[in-house]
A protein has these predicted regions:
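Local sequence-structure signature of Cys/Sec-based thiol-disulfide redox active-site neighborhoods
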Residues: 1-28
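C-terminal alpha-helical interaction module
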Residues: 1-8, 45-48, 68, 83-85
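Residues that form or flank phosphate/diphosphate-binding pockets in enzymes
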Residues: 16, 39, 65
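Non-catalytic interaction surface on structured domains
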Residues: 25-28, 46, 72
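Thioredoxin-like thiol-disulfide oxidoreductase module
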Residues: 34-52, 78-83
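Non-catalytic, surface beta->alpha helical segment in thiol-disulfide oxidoreductase systems
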Residues: 59-84
């Protein structure tokens, strides 16, 4: 099973949507709270090539992007392949 990490903020609707998709699929993930100014936020930006919006999603260490990119992967069928790896 793939290792999933999601950098999030409490009030973020896109974060909730991304987490909901993984929960609907029965896939476990690690949530990393990354409020503005936190070390976790800086880590998310570093790992994602400078992106500062939330969520930032990683599957097996590979940067996937945010919620829009996750939903695009789901729609194309590629998410299932990434999760099966």
């Amino acid at each position: 099973m793939a290792k999933i990490e999601i950098y999030t903020q409490d009030w973020c609707g896109y974060c909730a949507r991304a987490k909901s998709l993984f929960e609907q699929k029965g896939v476990a993930y690690t949530e990393i709270e990354a409020p503005h100014g936190s070390p976790a936020r800086a880590e998310a930006a570093r790992r994602s090539g400078g992106r500062t919006t939330m969520p930032q999603i990683f599957i097996d260490g590979r940067h996937i992007g945010g919620c829009d990119e996750l939903l695009a992967l789901e729609g194309s069928g590629q998410l299932a392949m990434l999760l099966a790896a």
